[in-house]
Amino acid sequence: MSKPSLDLQILTLPDNPGVYQYYDKDGKILYVGKAKNLKKRVSSYFNKIHDTAKTNVLVKKIVTIKHIVVPTETDALLLENNLIKTLQPRYNVLLRDDKSYPWICIKKEPFSRIFLTRRMVKDGSEYFGPYTNFKMVYTILDLIKELYPLRTCNYDLSQSNIDSGKFKVCLEYHIGNCKGPCEGLEPLEEYQRQVNAIREILKGNFKESLKDFKKLMNNYAQNLQFEEAQKIKEKIEVLENYQSRSTIVNPKITNIDVFSIISDESAAYVNFLQISHGSIIRSHTLEMKKKLDESDEELLELAIIELRERFQLMSKEIIVPFEIDLGENIKTTVPQLGDKKQILDLSIRNAKFYRIEQLKQLQIVDPDRHVNRIMAQMQKDLRLPVEPRHIECFDNSNIQGTNPVAACVVFKDGKPSKKDYRHFNVKTVEGPDDFASMTEIVYRRYKRLLDENQPLPQLIIIDGGKGQLSSALKSIDELGLRGKVAIIGIAKRLEELFYPGDSIPLYLDKKSETLKVIQQLRNEAHRFGITFHRDKRSKAALNSSVESIPGIGEKTMLTLIQHFKSVKRLKLATEKEISAVVGVSKAKKIVDFYKTN
């Protein structure tokens, strides 16, 4: 891959947290790193000479950059940890298992112990985490210890050992940190109830535990132990802000493949995440060019078969966004909530980012090709005789007929041409009559273009349904432009497209780039019109207000309108601020007027 191609990969990286992977010309992994902002972090490698020769050698070898987008920087840290262990890149300091992030373990044994560990032992015990913040782990363990007096000893508390009196209570019992299950002083059922409550805390369900904390806090307060009550309050706040699990890693999800798909009119993008032993170890996105009108279901089935064969995937369960048929030997899961749904959402997010990057690269490498493709697609979708290189869209704005205005926005080659935007004060219409207003402004716009011998658009879009379109057509007919300029109306509720003389609207695919361009035009016309209407209302209100002030003439009124823009700003201004605009004498009159009115 050439250097410009590498620059292009960097340029189109997202500004999101994630993990990046560097590969050499032979496709071998060189380095894995995490980033709060992928684009900034990766760019930094190529924008300077590094202090170490090793890093400079690494940069020279990089040919391909891959990345995985994740929700947070913490998730990036965890995923980096997993990928370094799995891929063992040459330029990374390899992370060994005894350097892993810590977990909280609920031991599978009578009177379960709860403790911090770096190793997961497959003995039926439960593990929660991993945690990147050690302070948070110790805070949680301290909370558990304060709220629930559990044992910390390593005794084998089988019923026979307890009955035989093999063990004696220790100091923890005497200072109130343990209820003495080793001597049978605490029933197993009561102990298990506390373990269940702790399990809910670690799962993120704090309701019952928070009730217990608040009860403890209130008891301290009633006993005038305000310092202790404050400590519990602070721990409640920590617990409420705590998120107990990573969306990237969950030990209960193991040996599962996740597939998601997003598509547009011409292509589909299938992302694949491989989960092994509770961790993401691989991510890949496959682009599929559509040849016919294939459904997402058909494309996803084809992609899954291709990816499973390419990467020799043997998992018996896959997570997908909708039901598909892959035969009896593969279980498909369509999660609606929980950890599996979060991982599916992450896969979808990576597919979306991949598509955005591909489109960005196309725009940078060959911007004309990108525009030409959209224009050709619009001509086809809208059944136009020519490509709509010049489009104009109209929108009316008025509130109960007051200050009626209209806006016309212009797009050229699919992009806003703001220097060509125009707004109109409606002159010939009385009251709230949007249809008559549309007739007037369309006539004025194209009468002027014809008089000045200016180029006409290839497409006119009217914001509104059949009624608004019919009103615009009156002017088009009067000017003799019927058949010379294409004109359509768009109804907001269902995004229906109406054509002259056709009672049945056209519905475009919601993913259609054509529809997106039309929606952008409509929204821009609405924004431009509303802004103009708001300014006009403010000036009208200020004009009316200033006219009522004795001793203030038309010239002063105009000066005030130009400076303060609205009545509210004029009323809030100090006498000194007003005098700087119109003089001391007139400023006093204005301030006195607003004090009494």
UniProtKB/Swiss-Prot annotation:
The UniProt GO MF terms for this protein read: DNA binding; excinuclease ABC activity
UVR domain span: 207-242
The function of this protein is: The UvrABC repair system catalyzes the recognition and processing of DNA lesions. UvrC both incises the 5' and 3' sides of the lesion. The N-terminal half is responsible for the 3' incision and the C-terminal half is responsible for the 5' incision.
Domain GIY-YIG stretches = 15-93
Q: Mind telling me which InterPro entries this protein's record contains?
A: GIY-YIG_endonuc, GIY-YIG_endonuc_sf, GIY-YIG_UvrC_Cho, RuvA_2-like, UVR_dom, UVR_dom_sf, UvrABC_protein_C, UvrC
* Annotated protein name in UniProt: UvrABC system protein C
The record ties this protein, via Gene3D superfamilies, to: 5' to 3' exonuclease, C-terminal subdomain, GIY-YIG endonuclease, UvrC, RNAse H endonuclease domain
Q: Which domain of life is it from?
A: Bacteria
Q: Which organism is it from?
A: Flavobacterium johnsoniae (strain ATCC 17061 / DSM 2064 / JCM 8514 / BCRC 14874 / CCUG 350202 / NBRC 14942 / NCIMB 11054 / UW101)
Q: Which SMART domains match?
A: GIYc (SM00465)
- For the keyword DNA repair, the answer is yes
